[in-house]
Design a protein with these regions (language model features):
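Beta-strand signatures of extracellular beta-sandwich domains
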Residues: 123-125
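Hydrophobic membrane-insertion alpha-helices, especially the h-region
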Residues: 39-57
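An anionic, turn-rich surface loop/hairpin at beta-sheet edges
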Residues: 134-162
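Short, exposed beta-strand-loop hairpins at the edges of beta-sheets
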Residues: 161-184
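N-terminal targeting leaders characterized by basic, low-complexity, disordered sequences
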Residues: 1-9
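Transition segment at domain starts
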Residues: 57-107, 138-142
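Short, surface-exposed binding/anchoring microloops in extracellular/periplasmic proteins
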Residues: 102-121
Length: 189
């Protein structure tokens, strides 16, 4: 190993030494130019970042429970007092944050016969005002009630806590708690 690389490895922070070692740069010797080292570090870190981002998107899909069938959801939603429709064309909905389908609301369950864009940590809220943007959601969140977790991205059923009085609210919202992203909403009264 060249004396230049030895000196750099001693001076460098631990993380940089680990990256240099992991890339095999130390074994290559002095023939490698500094620009090439930086290029390799940047490209490898970029690929790693892409992999983590892809994992964040795919992991919820892989660990999601099996969704209920349309017949099962229809049976549960037969006692619904209200219904609404999730649509893809809301202001803050996009190709990664959307929902579509029939939402049925009863004092026991809120169901969706349809699908949501996959993502982590989805929560179902009720609001006294219609919401279709992250700004509106954050502004009104203190007046909303959390119903529960949405665990599937197709045909979900969420149990409604007994202390929630449905006529007080008029909008059902799916929100990604981890990333603070609006997914979808529908006004049911």
């Amino acid at each position: 190993m060249s004396s230049f690389l030895q000196k750099q490895a001693v001076k460098s922070p631990t993380l940089l030494r680990a990256v240099i070692w992991a890339l095999g740069i130390i074994q290559i010797g002095s023939s490698m130019k500094f620009k090439k080292i930086i290029t390799l570090i940047v490209t490898h870190l970029s690929v790693g970042t892409f992999g983590v981002a892809l994992g964040i998107y795919i992991l919820p899909i892989l660990i999601a429970p099996t969704p209920l069938t349309v017949a099962e959801v229809t049976k549960i939603s037969s006692q619904a007092q209200y219904s609404a429709t999730f649509k893809k064309d809301l202001k803050d909905s996009d190709s990664f944050h959307w929902g579509e389908g029939l939402v049925s609301i009863s004092s026991e369950f809120i169901t969706l016969t349809g699908s949501l864009a996959p993502g982590p940590d989805y929560k179902l809220y009720l609001s006294t005002e219609f919401v279709e943007t992250e700004i509106d959601f954050n502004r009104l969140k203190t007046d909303m009630v959390l119903v529960g977790d949405v665990k599937t991205f197709e045909n979900f059923v969420v149990k409604v806590p007994q202390d929630i009085y449905l006529p007080r609210y008029n909008t059902v919202i799916v929100w990604c708690e981890t990333f603070g992203e609006f997914i979808t909403s529908a006004k049911y009264q």
